[in-house]
């Protein structure tokens, strides 16, 4: 955990500011960022649209699949747009929208594999990873 704390401290010391949105597994990342002093320098907002209706509202549409690459990309794009709404255009090169959507262990019989998608949106690029 010490390495994670050091990494998060470096993030908080940077010029970057983020809006983080997570649904399903991955919500602990928000908690981890907020636990380390300096979070107010980094985190502009965080969202946890956990229910389907909440996700529909966050995306302004109902996605084809809630845990998918397309949904993760849309979440990150909307998170980036939230950054722009909060602060002025001067800092936009330092804004990052980050999203995580995951389908992991649950209390009912799971249909399909465990999976997650992480996406990052900035002014100049979009990146994602899936597993």
Where are the model-predicted features located?
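Short alpha-helical segments enriched in small residues
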Residues: 1-131
């Amino acid at each position: 955990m010490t390495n994670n704390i050091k990494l998060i401290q470096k993030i908080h010391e940077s010029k970057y500011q983020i809006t983080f949105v997570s649904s399903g597994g991955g919500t602990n990342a928000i908690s981890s960022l907020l636990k380390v002093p300096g979070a107010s320098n980094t985190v502009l907002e965080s969202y946890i649209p956990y229910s389907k209706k909440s996700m529909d509202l966050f995306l302004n549409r109902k996605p084809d699949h809630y845990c998918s690459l397309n949904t993760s990309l849309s979440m990150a794009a909307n998170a980036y747009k939230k950054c722009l709404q909060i602060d002025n255009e001067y800092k936009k090169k330092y804004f990052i929208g980050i999203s995580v959507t995951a389908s992991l262990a649950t209390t009912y019989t799971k249909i399909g594999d465990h999976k997650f998608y992480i996406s990052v949106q900035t002014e100049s690029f979009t990146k994602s990873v899936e597993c």
